[in-house]
Design a protein with these regions (language model features):
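A generic N-terminal leader/anchor concept
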Residues: 1-54
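N-terminal pre-Walker A segment at the start of P-loop NTPase domains
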Residues: 1-22, 161-207
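Conserved nucleotide-sensing/catalytic segment adjacent to the nucleotide-binding pocket
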Residues: 1-14, 49-116, 120-121, 234-281
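Extended intrinsically disordered terminal tails
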Residues: 19-20, 64, 148-150, 154-157, ...
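Generic recognition of cysteine residues
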Residues: 23-24, 64, 143, 160, ...
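Residue-level preference for short coil/turn positions at secondary-structure junctions
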Residues: 26-27, 211-212, 263
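Glycine-rich phosphate-binding P-loop
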Residues: 30-49, 201-236
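An accessory alpha-helical subdomain
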Residues: 121-177
Length: 281
């Protein structure tokens, strides 16, 4: 099964990265791609993914959180091979060069020889885009402060205890009857299925449905989805399940979704709007 997700987010505190968990399991080999804008990093990785698919192999596509039409990485689970854009804001280096990683420099195909006039123009563009990003992060930070001000804090110890009992009962019903609940290997245990991008707010709801036939949607009008999702993750792991934690891009300390592919069950916040999801209020 092919899949797509994000490993970076434009958050209230700036760029937030989960790339440290990409292609780092025993036996994995990661090629870090270097090169400036326009050198074809995304297209190169897309061709790799398509070639793998043409040979009947699954591919995991890492979408760029700023521009979801662009790729920042691709991983072929059957081959334990990954390729990643290792340039800012998610600078990555091979852990042990030549053993579990190497480089490809697409910058060598750049057409150089620009004039001083071009240099000045490019510098102006870089200054402007840094300024725009700083402003955007400031707005996101302000939004999070407002969220904290208007959402009531109703989830104390007693409420969380009641919520835990309810979620534990739901998870017991989701758990396979044959007891097949062992924690299997999951590539990128933490990821994002939600981004604040140049195309606006984007939820990869279809990716959650691919992995989990049964979806529970946590209505978040009172701000309890984060607490419920963290409890669901704790309880599922205590039962031996392999869990994927999806963080909120604006505030990565919050959970956005918890997926349990081995049980084909998932819990999501109400922003995903998945038709047919069972609501937990």
């Amino acid at each position: 099964m092919n899949s797509a997700y994000f490993l970076g987010a434009n958050s209230k505190d700036g760029f937030y990265s989960l790339y440290g968990g990409f292609c780092c399991a025993p036996g994995d080999y990661l090629t870090v791609i270097k090169g400036g804008p326009g050198t074809g990093k995304s297209g190169f990785m897309r061709k790799i993914g398509r070639a793998a698919e043409a040979r009947g192999l699954d591919a995991e596509y890492i979408l760029c959180s700023g521009d979801p039409d662009s790729l920042d990485g691709v991983y072929i689970p059957a081959l334990h091979r990954g390729w990643v854009d290792g340039t800012a804001p998610h600078v990555i280096e091979p852990r042990r060069f030549g053993i579990d990683g190497d480089y490809v420099n697409l910058g060598s195909f750049y057409r150089f020889g620009l004039t001083a006039e071009h240099h000045n123009y490019v510098n102006q563009l870089y200054d402007r885009y840094r300024s725009e990003y700083a402003a955007a992060y400031g707005y996101l930070g302000a939004c999070e402060k407002l969220r904290g001000a208007y959402i009531p804090r109703l989830f104390g110890a007693e409420e969380c205890s009641s919520l835990r009992r309810r979620l534990r009962n739901i998870l017991k019903r989701c758990r396979p009857r044959d007891g097949a609940a062992e924690a299997g290997a999951i590539h990128c245990r933490e990821r994002f299925l939600h981004a604040l991008s140049c195309k606006g707010e984007l939820y990869l709801s279809g990716e959650a449905v691919k992995l989990c036939k049964l979806i529970y949607q946590l209505d978040d009008g009172l701000g309890g989805a984060d607490a419920a999702l963290k409890i669901a993750a704790e309880e599922a792991e205590a039962m031996g399940a392999a869990v994927i934690i999806c963080r909120c891009p604006a505030a990565p300390e919050r959970y956005d979704a918890v997926l349990i592919p081995g049980w084909s069950a998932g819990f999501v916040s109400d922003g995903y709007g998945i038709p047919g999801a069972r609501h937990i209020r």
